[in-house]
């Protein structure tokens, strides 16, 4: 999936905050 570039910053913050919590942390959501 893609996300609006205007939301990228928010997405980046969200990913940085939560991605490490998932199994195999650092996995990115597309």
UniProtKB/Swiss-Prot annotation:
The keyword Cytoplasm is assigned to this record: no
Superkingdom of origin organism: Eukaryota
Tissue expression: Expressed in the skin and the flesh but not the seed of the fruit.
Keywords, comma-separated and alphabetical: Antimicrobial, Fungicide
GO biological process, one term: defense response to fungus
Function of the protein: Has antifungal activity against P.infestans.
Record's protein name: Antifungal protein
Organism: Diospyros texana (Texas persimmon)
Phylogenetic lineage: Eukaryota, Viridiplantae, Streptophyta, Embryophyta, Tracheophyta
């Amino acid at each position: 999936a893609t996300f609006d570039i205007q939301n990228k910053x928010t997405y980046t913050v969200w990913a940085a905050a939560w991605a490490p919590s998932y199994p195999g942390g650092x996995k990115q959501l597309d």
